[in-house]
Swiss-Prot record:
The gene is gcvT. Keywords: Aminotransferase, Transferase. This is Aminomethyltransferase. The glycine cleavage system is composed of four proteins: P, T, L and H. It catalyses: N(6)-[(R)-S(8)-aminomethyldihydrolipoyl]-L-lysyl-[protein] + (6S)-5,6,7,8-tetrahydrofolate = N(6)-[(R)-dihydrolipoyl]-L-lysyl-[protein] + (6R)-5,10-methylene-5,6,7,8-tetrahydrofolate + NH4(+). PANTHER family: AMINOMETHYLTRANSFERASE, AMINOMETHYLTRANSFERASE, MITOCHONDRIAL.
Length: 370
């Protein structure tokens, strides 16, 4: 795998049986003991992920809050210090440049966590729109490693090696300078699995030690390292969207049912606001729906959705759900076919298989300490 980047944890994958693939230009483990085993481990116990390939950008300065609001669809004004917000960053047409997390450290200090596959594009977009805003933008991606501990036992495990009461960190809140196994880290109660859990940001040189410390701390509870395969099935079951599948620069947040994160009534302008106001007024012409395959087969990304011989959309993500044990998927279809109960076909390997539209919230589990 020449010319691929590596994370600070690259050296530990084989130690745990990791199978390496190219993901977003990085050598990353697709699985360790098998993605089904790993999926159930996170749902029932806890799993540890290397997510150091994600990007991190610091935005500071007198106009930091105004600048972030100009870039984002969500209402940045509601963020208090040490809180986290999920948002979209859109182009002028309302298409999604990226979906990301905004961490507010202080009034003029924000930390953006961006998707690995969009790092270069996002940083350029942010820099290109700096204009007259009095801000400093620093790409911190290469100087930060990130681990995610996810699952119902995550708090119990992590509590053993931190110097604070983790109950202090509520859902979508953060704490800086937490000592994790003696190393200073940023810890947030966030994740991409539909389970309770934490994301831990540390110095690259501390990542291996923390990886081993967390796995050792959770031995009794059955914690396991988790690869990209289970990461995708977990997020999919929880209806957490994946950039490049459910959204891209030609798809808007409104089309994928994420209008809650688009605050069109905020006083300030943001990039794409006018286009999204227009789209909301006129109504979307396509929608993201959940579906269940009624015939035997597995739907995959890109498969056509067909109604009465006409292509009405495409599958964005599809799997045989490990938790629900049935073939389900997400599809972007013409609006008139998006109602729950609507029947259509999915073209799987030249065969049209019957499917029915269902609620896309396939799996929900209340996150602790809301």
């Amino acid at each position: 795998m020449e010319d691929l980047k590596v994370t600070p944890l690259r050296g530990v994958y084989e130690e745990y049986g990791g199978k390496i693939v190219d993901f977003a230009g990085y050598e990353l483990p697709t699985q360790f003991k098998g993605f089904l085993h790993e999926h159930h481990t996170v749902r029932e116990k806890a799993g540890l992920f290397d997510v150091s390939h994600m990007g991190e950008v610091m935005v500071t300065g007198k106009d930091a809050g105004k600048f972030i609001q100009y870039l984002m669809t969500n209402d940045i004004n509601i963020l208090k210090d040490n809180e986290v917000l999920y948002t979209f960053m859109c182009n002028e047409d309302g298409g999604v440049i990226d979906d990301l997390l905004v961490y507010k450290f202080a009034e003029n200090e924000f930390f953006l966590v961006i998707n690995a596959s969009n790092k270069d594009k996002d940083v350029k977009w942010i820099m290109d729109h700096k204009g007259d805003f009095d801000v400093e933008i620093v790409d911190e991606s290469d100087s930060i490693a990130q681990l995610a501990l996810q699952g119902p036992l995550a708090e119990e495990i992590l509590q053993k090696i931190v110097d604070i009461d983790l109950q202090e960190i509520k859902f979508f809140k953060l704490k800086r300078d937490v000592l994790v196994n003696g190393k200073k880290c940023l810890v947030s109660r966030t994740g991409y699995t539909g389970e309770d859990g934490f994301e831990i940001y540390c110095k690259p040189e501390d990542a291996k030690g923390l990886w081993h410390a967390i796995l050792n701390a959770g031995k009794e509870e059955g914690v396991q390292p988790i690869g990209l395969g289970a990461r995708d099935t977990l997020r999919f079951e929880a209806s957490l969207l994946l950039y490049g599948n459910e959204m891209d620069e030609t798809i808007t947040p409104l089309e994928v049912g994420m209008g809650f994160f688009v605050k069109l009534k905020v006083e300030e302008d943001f990039i794409g606001k006018d286009a999204l106001i227009k789209q909301k007024a006129e109504g979307v012409t396509r929608k993201l729906v959940g579906f269940e395959l009624l015939d035997k087969g597995i739907p995959r990304h890109g498969y056509e959705v067909i109604k009465d011989g006409k292509v009405i959309g495409h599958v964005t993500t599809g799997y045989k759900s490990p938790t629900l044990n049935k073939a389900i998927g997400l599809a972007l279809v013409e609006e008139q076919y998006s109602k729950i109960g609507t029947e259509f076909n999915i073209k799987v390997r030249k065969k049209e298989l019957k499917a029915v539209a269902i609620d896309k919230r396939f799996y929900t589990k209340k996150t602790k300490t809301k």
